[in-house]
């Protein structure tokens, strides 16, 4: 999300090199949810999500009815509408991540980037958050270190080591004893349940 430039090669968005996009244009197309973070100022849940409309507003332009409607829709999707007047700082870790996801959705992105969004969350909140993401009608590119969660909620996986993609494909194609040995240096047995969840046993 434009924090660093590529050492080599070209990164494109919709066929256009990323450096040719302005920051505002990029923010209209791409939204980001990072690892758990604590904002340093107090805002309500609704105010936080409304920040997602910033790329669509000109300088000093006030939000319109449509902006508030999109915020409400985003809060409904993450099941946080009833808490829209709560202070962000008063929420649990899982609730905060859902609010940040709602803010990203309010941007109306075509691509949603998730950088370890479940880090520091209890397992229930991890499952809740990824289940919400799975149901969204938007392209999602996520960084996850939990292999079994990645298999459960992903359609396509890239398995990387030291910045290089070594394996890619469907979860079943990608997560094998051979790939886990190569990438992580561990021996394992991988079995799959009827609903295509990976069961990994490390030897």
What are these regions (language model features)?
Residues 9-17, 26, 86:
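Conserved ABC transporter NBD signature motif
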Residues 50, 65-83:
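Conserved ABC ATPase "signature" region
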Residues 1:
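Helix-to-loop junction immediately C-terminal to a conserved catalytic motif
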Residues 177-178, 182-203:
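ABC ATPase nucleotide-binding domains
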Residues 106-110:
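A short, proline-enriched helix->beta-strand linker immediately N-terminal to the Walker B motif
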Residues 112-116, 121:
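Catalytic Walker B motif of ABC-type/P-loop ATPase nucleotide-binding domains
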Residues 87-91, 95:
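Conserved ABC ATPase signature
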